[in-house]
Amino acid sequence: YVKFVAYDPVLNRGRGYWEETLARNVSPGLNNSTMPHELANTGPTTFTFGPISYKARLTGDDNTNPQPSFVGKKINSTFFYSNRFGVLSEDNVIFGVANDTYNFFSRSALTQTDADPIDLNVSSVRPVRLSDVLPSPQGLLLFSERQQFQVYATDASILTPASAVIRTLSNYEMATNIPPVDIGTTSAFVSRVPGYSKLFTMALRDVEQSPVVVDISKAVLEWIPDTVDDLTVSPPNSVVMLVDRDTSYLYMYRFYNNGKEDLFQAWVKWELPGTIQTARIVNDAVTVVSQQEDEYTIGSIELDELPSGDAVATSSSFTGNVPLDMTTRPVKPNASTDAVVYDTANDITKIYVPYTPINDKDAVMLLTVPTADKGTDAELDSDQGYWAKATER
């Protein structure tokens, strides 16, 4: 389909040229309101959520420049890879135009270029619903509930409509509600069986070889509950952490690899105060949002070998790693009240904390006082109330 474009745009006649155009009675493109939206950081403390302006279809028709295969179907995941915006929908993976974000249509209906969109089907004998993706040096990893796939370029160069292919990697079951994660040179995903969960790692080899898949939770078989519902990692610290939200437990796997094999592997279970809402490892620190009775708190602990978190700073230079058990310094509840206040009427010292004291937890104070003063009582206070007793250590 072409249209005549005159050199004289006013008279629109005379000399000119023919330009590709869109066929009549053909949809010009995608409905922005039903497509993935964006959450944009518009300021230090502000975000804006809204639709994205996807590029319109400018040439051809449904045969020569078809709609992407996700139209009329549910989109399961979005990603960016090889300078393309990608989408997972049912058993298809769709890449937009290269270096043209949010464009899923070819620029020309007459000629195919390397930048044109790519639409591939995994073609399996089993029902497949692609749920997650992870990048790798050998290509793009695709995950579904029962199979794993790899997208790569046959000529080992850039991904194009002519060079992109999909191959089946493995047939392991995966909990699709827990996104897989990248641990440096390997990937990790959770498999759930009745009564407990398993944690697998996958390491890719050459394109013609099968991946190496290892059940790293085999040493603690049936120890990880089937209620874990999140996964976070720290590749520099060789840490994988499973989160059991709405409980008090974190399950941590830590290892040491010399470049060839794991020389050390260990599993640890942490019990935290309150119920965990979410947990993430960012910048070598575990940050946990938890609910303590009727309020939410944020705690963090560093994972590096030499703790640098400052819990207490005194003349004795005592420092410690800020933990996840609600450790805090005294905090002023308001501008007119000090963080530590002596109550002369009741002969006690009130130490204010930035959260409401937890009724079923024992408070522990770390005091740097002369030996003669030990044994004195103190109460931890907040705006809503304070503990009746605190234990000194």
Model regions and ranges:
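Long, charge-dense tracts
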Residues: Y1-S69
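Short, surface-exposed terminal/edge motifs of secreted or surface/virion proteins that either
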Residues: V2-F4, G16, I94-G96, S290, ...
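Predominantly extracellular/luminal cell-surface or secreted proteins
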Residues: V2-V5, E19-T21, G96-D100, V151, ...
